[in-house]
Amino acid sequence: MERLDGKDSYIKKYCPVVDRVDVGEATARGWLSPYREYKVLIEVDDLSKYLELNREFYDHFSFFNHDFTLAMACASKWQKRVELAKIMCPDYANKPDEFKAINKQILIHAMGFNRALQGRKQFIYNHPKKIELTDLILKHRQDKKCITFSKTIKVAEKIGYGKVLSSKETKKKGRMTLEEFKEAKVGVLNTSKMLDEGADIPGLSVAVILGFDSSPTTKTQRIGRVIRKAENKVAEVFTFVIKGTVEEEWFRKSTSGKDFITIDSSNLLDVLEGREFTPKKNKETKMIFRF
């Protein structure tokens, strides 16, 4: 894993990777506790808001020929916009007005692209239905030790159970919050990104993932928080996915190769109360997802 300080180079030099063991193999060998992941497919009443943002997103994205790196660069760097404008107007030295108009057009599309991109993310990450279902899960698992993963601290603070561990706290208070939770037998700790990796918390058996992206590494690290080996433990992971959004594609990419059970919000209560239910077929909404 790369580090910002570059010290991963020492690991590569003196202790290179000689073998890899994935979660499935480690579980089969008994090194980790077994777990069930539930993909909770959520249908929301206000999906039209997302679809409008999505339409706007692709309108602007197409201007950049669906080149995500180019679109993002033009949104943040004026030099990149000038560079693109010169490509679109090769005779820019003799056509200054045309060059200026093209540069302005690039800026409009770049800002619109970024605005729609952030709008889609906000819709997905902050949807109140996720808070509602999280509280339902935690209400039914008050005899367990649970952790939630939100994309933002703001969402984590809205959850009705447990404490929040965030970068807003002082380091001392954060350590105290974490140590108290480690010592507890049951309870809830709500986090954003602080415990994605490197945290060893005994007794965890339930994870609720409200916000994620397409990274398989982050997904594996979060699951890893609740599958540390313990006798007679079967961990539960609930991952929320809003139907009809790019979150379906993020889930597919982040969960590739892993087993999961698809349910909807109507099945969730059956799962929580131990009743029989019929899993949904693992079919994605038929949409073209680029980003």
Describe every region a protein language model picked out:
Residues 1-37:
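Post-DEXD/H (motif II) to motif III coupling segment of the RecA-like Helicase ATP-binding lobe
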Residues 14-17, 32-37, 202-206, 231-237:
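Short glycine-/polar-rich loops that comprise or flank the Walker A/P-loop
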Residues 32-110:
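Inter-lobe connector of SF1/SF2 helicase motors
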Residues 49-65, 112-158:
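Conserved interdomain hinge at the start of the Helicase C-terminal
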Residues 76, 84-97, 263-291:
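Long, largely alpha-helical accessory region at the distal end of helicase-like NTP-driven motors
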Residues 145-150, 154-199, 218-220:
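Conserved helicase ATPase core of P-loop NTP-dependent helicases/translocases
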Residues 188-190, 196-213, 218-221, 234-241:
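A short beta-strand element within the Helicase C-terminal
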Residues 225-255:
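Conserved segment of the helicase C-terminal RecA-like domain
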